[in-house]
Amino acid sequence: MSYQKKQPTPQPPVDCVKTSGGGGGGGGSGGGGCGFFGGGGSGGGSSGSGCGYSGGGGYSGGGCGGGSSGGGGGGGIGGCGGGSGGSVKYSGGGGSSGGGSGCFSSGGGGSGCFSSGGGGSSGGGSGCFSSGGGGSSGGGSGCFSSGGGGFSGQAVQCQSYGGVSSGGSSGGGSGCFSSGGGGGSVCGYSGGGSGCGGGSSGGSGSGYVSSQQVTQTSCAPQPSYGGGSSGGGGSGGSGCFSSGGGGGSSGCGGGSSGIGSGCIISGGGSVCGGGSSGGGGGGSSVGGSGSGKGVPICHQTQQKQAPTWPSK
């Protein structure tokens, strides 16, 4: 009597989600400029919203970058227009409405990033408001925080605990999760490793952070916010956010001066280089065209066949 173990039917590898290339390009007045992580499209709102979307939960959020933390999309709240729900797809358009508020931003003006946290930011081009904490007020603040949830499939980086970023910076650029007001405050960024290099006060914020590579654990495009960028541009400008992975923090030099863009760079390469001053901005914009290329980020499962038992 012969026994032969049935081989499992080989399954195709997990489909990689390829982020849409291009993007970049701030639109709107004052240049919102936010590129997308993973190279997605951007599209800025007016009054400089510098934001991108948060990792895991794919969705675009275009200029508004609202980026919801963790899985599901859903446009940002608080004026964040674009962003369609989805699992790992970036949808191009979107764009922020009005002052280009970032997702989860209850404040006016362009608020920058996406945070899963509560406090909205108020004031022009504020960056992110970390979870739990109050938003930043005044000029551009730097980073983005993902409260709690964070990006799907990876550890939350750049997250503030209990409101680490209490006030954000007022006036000039602030670092991400900056605690305390005044010009650029050092980012009190927790988690991840590299912090932001403190934001610069006034003028153009230079400090960008080194990014941190995060182990991919799902097939979703996951920009790892290994180090928030401090950054923050001059008045009104939101800082750039650098994501980990490929691009590192290059290109996110310091946000722009003027109402302005804050660029972010994608995990696959920089999407915006430095942000532009004034009008168009962000994204890989020079003139608002995006050069960021989408990169497929995912894990392909390796198939193993069960051994075939010899006939007896």
Curated annotation (Swiss-Prot):
The protein's name: Loricrin
Entry's Gene Ontology BP terms: keratinization; keratinocyte differentiation; peptide cross-linking
Cross-link Isoglutamyl lysine isopeptide (Lys-Gln) (interchain with Q-154): residue positions: 89
UniProt organism field: Homo sapiens
GO molecular function, one term: structural constituent of cytoskeleton
Positions of region (Disordered): 1-27, 276-312
Pfam families: Loricrin
Predominant location category: cytoplasm
Biased composition (Gly residues): 276-293
GO cellular component labels: cornified envelope; cytoplasm; cytosol; nucleoplasm
Name of the gene this protein is made from: LORICRIN
Linked residues for Isoglutamyl lysine isopeptide (Lys-Gln) (interchain with Q-216): 89
Positions bearing the Isoglutamyl lysine isopeptide (Lys-Gln) (interchain with Q-213) cross-link: 312
Polar residues compositional bias, start-end: 299-312
Disease: Vohwinkel syndrome with ichthyosis: A variant form of Vohwinkel syndrome without hearing loss and associated with ichthyosiform dermatosis. Clinical features include palmoplantar keratoderma, pseudoainhum and ichthyosis. Compact hyperkeratosis with round retained nuclei and hypergranulosis is observed on skin biopsies.
Job of this protein: Major keratinocyte cell envelope protein.
Residues in cross-link Isoglutamyl lysine isopeptide (Gln-Lys) (interchain with K-312): 212-213
Record location of the Isoglutamyl lysine isopeptide (Gln-Lys) (interchain with K-89) cross-link: 154, 216
Sequence position, cross-link Isoglutamyl lysine isopeptide (Lys-Gln) (interchain with Q-212): 312
Subcellular location: Cytoplasm; Nucleus, Nucleoplasm
PTM per Swiss-Prot/TrEMBL: Substrate of transglutaminases. Some glutamines and lysines are cross-linked to other loricrin molecules and to SPRRs proteins.
Transmembrane segments: none
